[in-house]
């Protein structure tokens, strides 16, 4: 049977991690279909159909799909599920809200946050805050799986021409209503998809000192991250938190400043391509995953770093 991917989008555009999810889903079966649920989402459906790995797109439209409400989306997927062996979506806020409802309705065990497809029924997922990995084999006829998108490369975004089939929507779930959306506007790259992330920890000592992190991020056109300790101390808002209970990031460059490296934080960033750590404690766990480490007082090292960055006129923004 085929694989069904639940595409994440904002009606006009596909969310970037959808391309990573397509790569993961295609490794389970080459007959990959994708469903897109929304309102006036024709443009996103067309872009989905252009992904070479997608063989068919199912488009479901209604006004009550304008905004994501898991109680409205889940019945659509459950109805389609009879034709598929695997139901896939990303292990982010979207997937963590949606997939448990689908799995419960299908009476199947969910396999969460996989980082590798070993075979069509066996997957690898992290446990113990990423310090160990467990292969999981599912014998369920219907497999509900969430994937860690940062563990898979994005697929090619053009060259495909999958047919688009429109399907009738399910009725609106009246016990849950979308109230409002609150978005934080920023000119910075999004933390979850940024090429460069500069993060600060409790070693910053205050919210005012986080201006040093901002200065470095400005020079590198980077996203700003933080450890949970920095967030709990009130130095920065929790939407910047990186780690097991925050965002998982895999940038090309991750700069950790004043972060000791608790296992919960390492779980969210240790797969970064290059890791640079700056900490005055030479025994800090962050150095165990760092490609480059500087044992120094950050309040001396970072101003010098900023000064050197100011001298470089070749940095592209």
Placement of each model-derived feature along the sequence:
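N-terminal glycine-rich FAD/FM-binding segment characteristic of electron-transfer flavoproteins
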Residues: 1-317
């Amino acid at each position: 049977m085929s694989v069904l991917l639940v595409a994440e989008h904002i009606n006009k555009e596909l969310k970037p991690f959808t391309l990573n999810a397509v790569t993961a889903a295609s490794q389970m079966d080459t007959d990959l279909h994708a469903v897109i649920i929304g309102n006036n989402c024709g443009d996103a459906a067309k872009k989905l159909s252009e992904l070479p790995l997608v063989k068919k797109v199912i488009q479901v439209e209604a006004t009550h799909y304008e905004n994501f409400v898991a109680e409205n989306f889940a019945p659509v997927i459950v109805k389609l599920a009879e034709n598929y062996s695997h139901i896939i979506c990303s292990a982010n806020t979207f997937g963590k809200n949606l997939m448990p409802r689908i799995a419960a309705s299908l009476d199947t065990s969910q396999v969460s946050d996989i980082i590798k497809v070993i075979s069509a029924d066996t997957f690898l997922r992290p446990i113990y805050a990423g310090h160990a990995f467990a292969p999981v084999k599912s014998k369920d006829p219907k497999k509900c799986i969430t994937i860690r998108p940062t563990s898979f490369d994005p697929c090619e975004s053009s060259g495909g021409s999958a047919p688009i089939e429109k399907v009738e929507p399910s009725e609106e779930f009246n016990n849950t209503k979308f109230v409002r959306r609150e978005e934080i506007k920023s000119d910075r790259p999004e933390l979850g998809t940024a090429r460069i992330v500069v993060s600060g920890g409790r070693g910053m000592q205050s919210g005012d000192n986080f201006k040093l992190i901002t200065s470095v991020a400005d020079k590198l056109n980077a996203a700003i991250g933080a450890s949970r300790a920095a967030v709990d101390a009130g130095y920065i808002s929790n939407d910047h938190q990186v780690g097991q209970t925050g965002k998982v990031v895999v940038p090309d460059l991750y700069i950790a400043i004043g972060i000791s490296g608790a296992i919960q934080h390492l779980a969210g960033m240790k797969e970064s391509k290059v890791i640079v750590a700056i900490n005055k404690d030479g025994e800090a766990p962050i150095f165990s995953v760092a490609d480059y480490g500087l044992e120094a007082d950050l309040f001396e090292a970072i101003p010098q770093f900023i000064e050197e960055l100011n001298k470089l006129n070749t940095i592209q923004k």
